[in-house]
Amino acid sequence: MENKKFARILALTDIFLLVLLAGGPVLKEKIEEARKREIYLEQEQSREEGQENGPEREEADAESPGQENRKSAHRELPEVLLTLEGEGEQLKISLWQSNEGSCYFFLPGFAKGKGLILDSAPGGSVYLENMEIKEGDVLREISEEKVYELSVPGENETESLNAGLIFMYSSELPVLSLSTNSGSMELIEEDKGNEEAGGAVLYDQMGAKLYEGQAESIKGRGNSTWGLAKKPYQIRLCEDVDFFGFGKAKAWNLLANGYDETRLRNQIVLGLARELGMNYVPEGQMVDLYINDSYRGNYYLTEKIRVDEGGVAIRDMEKLTETVYSPEELEMLEPVQNEDGTRKWVETGLSGEDITGGYLLERELKSRFQTELSGFVTDQGDCYTLQSPLYASEEQVNYIADLMQEFQDAIEEKDGIHPLTGKHYSEYIDVDSFIQKYLVEEVSKNYDGGVTSSFFYKPQDSVSKKFFAGPVWDYDVVFGNCNLDKIASNPVGITRLNDHVYGTDVFVELYGKEDFYDRMIKMYEEKALPYLNALLDGKIDEMVAESRNSAEMDSIRWEELENRYQYYEEYDNDVRYLKYFIKERRDFLNKVWLEGESYHNINFVVDGEIWQITCIRDGETPDAEPIPARYSGGSLFMGWFTEDGVPYDIYKPVYEDMTFYASWQELSALEKPQEDS
């Protein structure tokens, strides 16, 4: 029943709003000023250290569940809950308080124009603008522009809450509401491997319920992103469910986009993959996520990469293993490996009559490969893990490893023909899918391209005897959103997916094959370029308009900036940079691939690893000489030299790719720079 006193105060509030509306921008400035704070970059070391340690450092960070959570994700507050009138009435929204003390109700977009019902509060009531609001009372015509005075009585003064209260409404996005059986996320966020059962309710953008059911498990996911306070999750439902027409599945991922302040890069790159015609591109939808009634932010709900009819539609060789072994028995199986550790498998005693497929492979970092059950390392040093079958037999691993080795040996030959089998490289791979994969990674200048989260699949021979590239996955550090070195954030340059310290030579070799290159250029001009043009001609602006309010709520909810890749504080500037990078990248690729301009890479190597790559137009001179460090380990930097001892010269034009190595001279104790005491 509605409280009459509150109705009177709202009438007075309407008068005040005429004055306050004019001051709306001031309120926004105050909110922004309150949430700005020192950026925490100690989560991972500086960019230079990141280059020295590489992605293995990220792996170590990802496996450190004890990292301090600075986001006030579990701030102890009086439990005050709101529900909505009409559609979405089952959804409950809890009160949240920032580090500065301001309180918020983060409301879904479909709550606009609806009454807000006080569902529960300590003692049965709260005070808003000094007027008592009881459980069951309805709040109407709430303003987003106003800071309300909230008082929640406690048993004593120290337990009482008195603070400013702001109501924020999200964009018109669907809402996913999860609950854990314990009512807490403590167990799940303690360790990525922990999981808990619970419930799941999905609402569309109008508040209509699309699904309600049980979740078999809710758990963490991701690698370096798991180290952030805003964590990515994976849910597994108790039944196959079709979300948004994506196809039926039990397992779904919730990407936090923790490194991407625009929250658009994954969505944009997956769209590029679809335009190129790739198979099995994961579908996704931006949602507002609530867990145990608490707003958790803006997430990208997407399919999990999997082998089945709705995913990667190849034969599932894991089914035989699952019919023989229980899940508990599978957990007890230990991997076995050969002497040099380049091939490993699981002794199940099973292989099946046809071992030609299907296989789902992931090219991975060496550190992550070591923790996987099945996989192999090629002679070229590429580590592949078997994601399906996960419990691969020795016979299966040897078959797929030998086939991949033959392919990589073939592309190293100038004519692309394997010296022993006589097969052309195109007999080992579906060339179009590899071109699509290359374009997705190169156009977006993905720092992780070809390094990790890089999938390939091989159907059984009766379907195809070739490897296919894909599905594509994980694109939060693309389009310049990575400052670990001076390569990824530069829109100029052809990476060939080998600019990373742990990169692969596969696409370097393919890029050098005339038939591959010509088909790649044609696909870029006909499919990739129109998509980039559409992004810049308004598509990005449309995406921003659809999610801006949600992004603003997300930014306030996760108020302390810990994203090591964040360069700008304002959301609009992050979007401007994204559009800037895409435009500059498109223009550069057009010059090289369509207009025939020639560019060359100057590689600068420090301690055996590429430290920096400078891309120079043919015939031009470099701008300056990069300096890695004046002193390193008691040695003085003496300059850059080729393997033959020729020094780097910024006054000489560049006509070809070149590589220079850092030269150091060890200093005596008297010559070493003195450190400050």
Describe each PLM feature range.
Residues 228-267, 405-428:
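Short, conserved helix/loop micro-motifs enriched in His/Cys and acidic residues
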Residues 7-14, 23-171, 668-671:
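Beta-rich interaction/scaffold domains
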Residues 124-128, 276-288, 446:
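Short, well-structured beta-strand/strand-turn elements
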Residues 381-451, 458-459, 464-601, 668, ...:
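Middle-to-C-terminal accessory/interaction subdomains
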Residues 196-256, 396:
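Conserved oxyanion/phosphate-binding beta-strand-loop segments in alpha/beta enzyme cores
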Residues 89-103, 114, 596-677:
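Secondary-structure capping and domain/repeat boundary segments
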Residues 111-112, 140-146, 157-159, 193-195, ...:
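Extracellular interaction modules
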Residues 241-242, 278-282, 295-437:
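Internal "kinase-insert"/substrate-recognition segments embedded within catalytic cores
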